[in-house]
Amino acid sequence: MSVEQSLLGKETQYPTSYQPDVLFPIARAQSREKYAHIEGITQGKDWWHVFEISWLNAHGIPQVAIGRITLPASSPNLIESKSLKLYFNSLNFTQFDSTQSFIETVEKDLSAAAGAKVELTLFQVDDLEISKPQGICIDDLMPERLEQHPDATLLKLDESDEEIEVELYSHLLRSNCPVTGQPDWGTVFIRFKGKKPCYRSILAYIISYRQHNGFHEQCVEQIFADIWQNLQPEKLMVYATYTRRGGLDINPCRVSDLTWMPKPIRLARQ
């Protein structure tokens, strides 16, 4: 299905009965065509936090939780966010015999939409803790050049020719939803092993996304691919934690080496 057929940016009625068919898959293949040869572009996970989960227990009493969805980057489809919100709304008045029954139903429906096994972990509403970023924040550096759209030529190696392993992060990631034009804000983590990159050039590159139209997952994959091709690290991880919209936040992560998969976190802006 094409994104133009989705419910993004359109007035919709919120379902009050279970409707798994509202889920809208979007194929990953088209946006990945020019990165198909990049090692790691399909390695990783998309973590979603769902803050508006509710269903009825066997006695008809409302239950609430925070959910973490884990969707493999190797899945043929991602799931459009508004359709996911509507799907969870459709469960608000549906009775389940147990919490496990609720989890199994959601996992079955999301796996069918994604075309791969999707996992749901539930947290009590007070239990999903806020983490602090680890690594070197590059936001106070001064880039040599600024662009308003992604420009891989901004990426440079440091003049020292030093071999390093480092984790950098920036809170300055901004891009736009390709359908509604609404801004998406995020923190991006970059773990890098290889010849030392110029940190100012990486910041300039991140800033260049400010007027770019792309889904969260696509932006992370483009960042990963551009760094991989232009800075040629031995190992690379790119992980973005986007702020919440409509009760959901999306956190894509791509890695060249599966041993570099981080644990999912939740930051203060989420």
Swiss-Prot record:
Report the pathway entry.
tRNA modification; tRNA-queuosine biosynthesis
Task: Report the record's Gene Ontology biological process terms.
Answer: queuosine biosynthetic process; tRNA modification
Give the Enzyme Commission number. Answer: 1.7.1.13
Keywords tagged on the record: Cytoplasm, NADP, Oxidoreductase, Queuosine biosynthesis
Binding of substrate: at which residues? Answer: I79, E80, S81, H216, E217
The reaction(s) annotated as catalysed by this protein in its Swiss-Prot or TrEMBL entry are: 7-aminomethyl-7-carbaguanine + 2 NADP(+) = 7-cyano-7-deazaguanine + 2 NADPH + 3 H(+)
**What Gene3D superfamilies does the record tag this protein with?**
3.30.1130.10
According to its record, what are the GO cellular component terms?
cytoplasm
Q: Name one Pfam family in it.
A: QueF
GO-annotated molecular function: preQ1 synthase activity
Please state where this protein is localized: Cytoplasm
Homology family: Belongs to the GTP cyclohydrolase I family. QueF type 2 subfamily.
Q: Which NCBIfam families match?
A: QueF
* Matches recorded under HAMAP family: QueF_type2 (MF_00817)
Per the entry, what this protein does is: Catalyzes the NADPH-dependent reduction of 7-cyano-7-deazaguanine (preQ0) to 7-aminomethyl-7-deazaguanine (preQ1).
Identify this protein by name: NADPH-dependent 7-cyano-7-deazaguanine reductase
